[in-house]
Regions:
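Conserved beta-strand position repeated across blades of beta-propeller domains
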Residues: 47, 54-57, 103, 164, ...
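Asp-box/WD-like beta-propeller blade repeats and closely related beta-sheet repeat scaffolds
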Residues: 127-164
Length: 382
């Protein structure tokens, strides 16, 4: 699996002033951008008036659930955003925390279940957790059943939050290091990891360490991952922003079960024994939001590419890999703030209609919030 992952230099490496050699297959991009994209595309507005829409879930009847970071679940019905929330959950919506990822149960058509990752106060501290919900038959309300995974480290920044069901039917949960870099290397911590659990919340069978939910380690703050094939992932991760004197170097990497992506021990394109080197590194901070592999027909030239929403440098980034797993091409679309571009991009996911669906994050306190607030759009061929 290819991943965007930023590696920071280890404290030991800093102390000895040594630097690991660069991995030969890693592409270092000197800026936070890339070549201008050449594929004609068209952007269609689906909904506006949202507040930091973080995740999308497509229902079998064509409706779409949208999470808003302040704690609301909204419904797009018949192409229109309904006013009343489907559900509201109590969250700690400060910094990067709040209501984040959402995923439908693989058996949703039978059980109406979906899952959400969010930050909340518990016993005098903030934690992240994954809770299971059941959607009413009319789709207008939902009830919370129970937490299937709880006490994931939380902080003002680095909360991770993307959740997706894999081709194996297991739930994959991306967590942040909660501003405690060593947690990413601590097998006892669920921080700074990609976790793999059953729909009931137990560590999934076949995990690298029996009885542990940890599938990948060495992550800093991942919001984007998808599958290249049934056993290989592509992951995007945020690089350091001052830890150990390091900054920038957001990454895309390819990984498999048990891999260590290196944070905080290595960073940039460095190769190190027992660590997976990234495929692509941005020298200047991007950083990446959500991302997905595109396999649809609406934009044939993008098929087989990893599309990433870029927050800081405000664009959509396409990454194409060659048969050898190295970056064959990468390019930029929709750069800049509206009306030229879309601004800060958060969720990027292929819809059942074959279009690429994208949410903006211009009202998260780090962008310019327009009068229409944040939007949901679909992207098709031009």
């Amino acid at each position: 699996m290819h991943r965007f992952i930023t590696f920071a230099a280890a404290a030991l490496s800093l102390a000895s002033c040594s630097r690991a050699a660069d991995a030969p297959g890693c592409l270092l991009v000197p800026s936070g951008y890339g070549p201008e994209g050449q594929v004609p595309i068209r952007v269609e507005r689906v909904a506006s008036g949202l507040e930091v829409p973080w995740g999308l879930a497509f229902l079998p009847d064509g409706d779409v659930l949208v999470t808003e970071r302040p704690g609301r679940v909204r419904l797009i019905h018949g192409g229109r955003l309904l006013g009343a929330p489907v559900a509201s959950v109590p969250v700690t919506a400060r910094g990067e925390g709040g209501l984040l990822g959402i995923a439908l149960d693989p058996r949703f058509a039978e059980n109406r279940r979906f899952y959400m990752y969010f930050t909340r106060a518990k016993d005098g501290r903030d934690v992240n957790g994954v809770a299971r919900f059941t959607l009413a038959a009319d789709g207008r309300s939902a009830r919370q059943d129970r937490f299937i995974l709880d006490d994931i480290p939380a902080a003002r920044f680095h909360d991770g939050g993307r959740i997706r069901f894999g081709p194996d039917g297991m739930l994959y949960v991306a967590t942040g290091d909660a501003r405690e870099p060593p947690s990413a290397q601590d097998p006892r911590s669920t921080g700074g990891k990609l976790l793999r659990i059953t729909p009931g919340g137990a560590p999934a069978p076949g995990n690298p360490t029996p009885g542990s939910p940890v599938f990948l380690s060495g992550l800093r703050n991942t919001e984007a991952f998808d599958w290249l094939d049934a056993r290989t992932l592509i992951v995007a991760d945020h690089g350091p922003s001052g830890e150990m004197g390091r900054s920038g170097h957001d990454e895309v990497s390819v990984a498999r079960a048990g891999d260590d992506l290196g944070w905080p021990d290595v960073w940039r394109c460095e190769a190190a024994r027992g660590r997976v080197a990234p495929a692509l590194v941005f020298r200047e901070a991007v950083p990446p939001g959500g991302g997905s592999m595109y396999r649809g027909d609406a934009i044939p030239a993008w098929r087989g590419s990893f599309l990433i929403g870029i927050l800081g440098s405000r664009h959509l980034h396409r990454v194409a890999l060659g048969a050898d797993g190295r970056v064959a091409a990468h390019e930029v679309y929709l750069a800049g703030d509206p009306p030229k571009g879309l601004g800060r991009l958060r969720e990027v996911v292929q819809g059942p209609d074959g279009a690429l669906w994208v949410t903006t994050s211009n009202c998260d306190g780090r962008g310019t919030c327009p009068a229409e607030k944040d939007v949901v759009v679909r992207i098709v061929g031009g």
